[in-house]
Structures are given as structure tokens and as C-alpha cells.
Amino acid sequence: MSTENTLSVADLARENVRNLVPYQSARRLGGNGDVWLNANEFPTAVEFQLTQQTLNRYPECQPKAVIENYAQYAGVKPEQVLVSRGADEGIELVIRAFCEPGKDAILYCPPTYGMYSVSAETIGVERRTVPALENWQLDLQGISDNLDGTKVVFVCSPNNPTGQLINPQDLRTLLELTRGKAIVVADEAYIEFCPQATLTGWLVEYPHLVILRTLSKAFALAGLRCGFTLANEEVINLLLKVIAPYPLSTPVADIAAQALSPQGINAMRDRVAQTVQERQYLVNALQQTACVEHVFDSETNYILARFTASSSVFKSLWDQGIILRDQNKQPSLSGCLRITVGTRQENQRVIDALRAEPV
């Protein structure tokens, strides 16, 4: 048998996948720490007991209790809610439903969350970037100049990793610019820490607005992998065409429904209040720490700070088992590290370690 035209497995793969640099998640980056402040998780576990023990049947595609509970919590109709394997799947579903590979583009504004880029690249969709302004707000002129051929614009508010809200008037301008041209995805993964800023009330006005949500942050369920897409019914119906038939396992749906009960939502709000209190403690302490140049305002469960020698600080804390998130490679974030708000004990360990750093 001739082997002249034999291809390796790598050769058989799509070119864009061969060239793809996968998203560097906190777990993928590894580390042997005992203080994990690099993934914006809630620092302590929340206990649940499974009430659904029947696992020999496939689950519902969109579990009724989860959809109805989330709709009530978010103040939208059940028909405007889709549940998925984390908000990350929601990102991918929107790109798959609206973007033609090799023809259409997505647009995002770095520094921001990395999965918009990775999801588009995986699917073979062009990625356009319009860097944020110096104050990390939207460059509306730059976005307007790049809308031809753009089908989806991603905006993270509050933005990860910078922590600030996007100006609501700028968001409204963006929605007017894109009306009839592109979908605007507002990533509200951290909205529970600033609920007054949600865009859910705008859905009736903007049929091309899509909102992403998650149970990973304030609901303390990062390990559950459960996210939500909020949009008008026409958009939801399109996303339902491309979602997997059984995106949520029965145990995930069971726990999600419990987390979204009135008691679960009250517990979440207590966690938010606790986190905001700890965030202020951490901010105050960082501002009085010699190796810290600047602490940026945050509306989230993490803090971005600029350090005099961020790389050595990052490694020093890593070696002490304190794992932070290095942001040096992000545009305009030279010298910056992101610190998840932990427990008081964890936060104090960070401060003590930073104050021991040479200046």
C-alpha cells in the first residue's frame, strides 16, 4: 500500500485548530497553591442535596424549573431564557447561530475576557479587535468603523479583568449603531455585584441584544457549569437549533433549580454583601502596600492592581502557594495582576506576602 499521500493526524485537523492557542483557564495554568485567587470563584463551598435520583432517563433540553426560576429572578419571560453549560457555551452558540465561517466576523474590545476570541477562532470566524480607550470604555468610533461584515459584538460589563462597568450611554449608542446590522452580546457574568447595571430592561427595545449570565460567580457554583442566555424569543429559538440536545445533566438542573429558589437567591445576596465587604478591606490594604502602584476601582469580586515589579511579585506569591492571575499580556495591562476576593484569612495572606516584597 502506498504511503506517499498519507497524512498525520495533525495534518488531518483543520488549519485554524492546528494554529489555535487554547484559552488559558485558571485550572489549565496549574499551580500547587492553597490560596486560589485566580479564577474569580467564591472562596467557600455551598452545600446542596440532590433531590432527583432518577438517572436512567435523559434530561429535558431546557429544564422547566431552572428556566422558570431564572426568568423570575432576572425579571424576564421564560421564553427569553436559555440555559447552557456555563456562559462559555452561550458565547459559542451565538457565534455558531449568527456567523458564517470565512465570511462574517465578531468584534470585541480588549482588554477583556478571552473566550470570545477562542470560540470564534475554533469555529473559523474572523476576529476583530477595537481596543478600549485609556479609561477602558468603548471606542465607539473605532467600533463603528469596523461594523461592515461584523455579525456579533461582545461587550463585558462589568469587564473582566478590569472590573469596571461600561458606560450605559455608550452601550445604548452601540445598540443604535448595530441595529439591523449585528447582534450585541452583553456579558453580565458579574452583574450580581452591581445588579442596578443590568441591561435586561432593554431587551424589549433592542431585538438584537443578547445577555449572558452564570451561576459560577455570586452563586458560588463554578463547578456546576451552568450559564444562561437572555434574549428575545426569536433569538432564543435560533440558539435552540444549535444547542446540544441535553446540555444540562439531571444533577446540574436539580442543583441549579435549588440555587434559584427564593432561599437560594437570598443566600446569594448574602454572599455578595460579604464579598463587597471583603473587597473594600482588600482595596484599603492594597492601597497601603509599598509594591502596589495603583488599585483600580471594581464592581466585581476581584481587584485589578498595578505593581512595581508584577512578574517577580506573581512568582513570589506563587512560590508561597498564593495563586493570582497575571494580566501582563493583555493590552494596556502591563504590570497588572488580578486578585480574586477571598476569605478574610486568604486576603490577609495576600497582604502579608505583598508587604514582605522588596520595593
From Swiss-Prot:
GO terms for molecular function: histidinol-phosphate transaminase activity; pyridoxal phosphate binding. Its cofactor is pyridoxal 5'-phosphate. It catalyses: L-histidinol phosphate + 2-oxoglutarate = 3-(imidazol-4-yl)-2-oxopropyl phosphate + L-glutamate. Belongs to the class-II pyridoxal-phosphate-dependent aminotransferase family. Histidinol-phosphate aminotransferase subfamily. The modification N6-(pyridoxal phosphate)lysine is found at residue 217. Gene3D superfamilies: Aspartate Aminotransferase, domain 1, Type I PLP-dependent aspartate aminotransferase-like (Major domain). It comes from the Bacteria. Keywords: Amino-acid biosynthesis, Aminotransferase, Histidine biosynthesis, Pyridoxal phosphate, Transferase. The lineage of its organism: Bacteria, Pseudomonadati, Pseudomonadota, Gammaproteobacteria, Enterobacterales. Homodimer. Pfam families: Aminotran_1_2. Its EC number is 2.6.1.9. NCBIfam families: hisC. Pathway: Amino-acid biosynthesis; L-histidine biosynthesis; L-histidine from 5-phospho-alpha-D-ribose 1-diphosphate: step 7/9. This is Histidinol-phosphate aminotransferase.
